[in-house]
A protein has these predicted regions:
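ADP-ribose/NAD+-binding catalytic cleft of ART/PARP-like enzymes
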Residues: 1-40, 53-56
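Short, solvent-exposed loop/turn segments at secondary-structure junctions
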Residues: 21, 46-48, 89-91
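Short helix/loop capping segments that flank catalytic or ligand/cofactor-binding pockets
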Residues: 24, 49-51, 94
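Aromatic-enriched hydrophobic runs in primary sequence
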Residues: 38, 44, 84-86
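Short C-terminal domain-edge/linker segments immediately following a structured domain
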Residues: 42-47, 120
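Short active-site loop/helix that positions an aromatic residue
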Residues: 45-62
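Active-site and NAD+-binding cores of ADP-ribose-processing enzymes
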Residues: 59-154
């Protein structure tokens, strides 16, 4: 893993979480890094949904948790997830992106996917405070709207 410091993002940030976490997050007024070094966000709803496609929507796929232990993604239930649209409050801390590193000879397709994955996420080193009353989007509804949008093909 290679972290790269970036400028503080401008505008809104998006963070997906399980519905069961919402009450505590709203009471707390912050997204906590928990066992990680950073808490992670996306710059748009579209990026958030794509990140979810590459992670929590990959039922049964292997990943490594924050303790470095191998795990498998459980069955994805869209109704269990929400996306918070956040206005960050000013605070000190480093903003980073995480650049996936690959061994020499890694297939180009895998490298491109890793680059996309790395640039979907924006990390904040610390707990990110946000202004009250963030918009909360239902992931099930977002996915339904996404599939109903007309697809233009050429």
């Amino acid at each position: 893993m290679a972290y790269e410091r970036i400028d503080r993002p401008k505008g809104l940030l998006y963070h997906y979480t399980k519905r069961e976490n919402i009450e505590l997050i709203l009471q707390d007024g912050r997204i906590r890094k928990l066992r990680d070094t950073e808490c992670w966000f996306c710059a748009s709803l579209e990026d958030t949904l794509r990140l979810m496609e590459l992670t929590v929507m990959e039922e049964g796929k292997l990943y490594y948790d924050t303790n470095g232990l191998p795990r498998r993604y459980p069955k994805f239930i869209p109704e269990e997830y929400v996306v918070l649209e956040l206005s960050p409050r000013y605070q000190n801390g480093d903003w980073v992106i995480w650049n996936q590193e690959f061994p020499d000879g890694a297939p180009e397709e895998i490298q491109k996917l890793g680059e996309e994955f790395s640039h979907l996420k924006i990390g904040f080193r610390g707990d990110l405070r946000f202004y009250e009353n963030p918009n909360i989007y239902e992931v099930a509804q977002l996915l339904q709207e996404q599939t109903q949008a007309p697809q233009i093909t050429m």
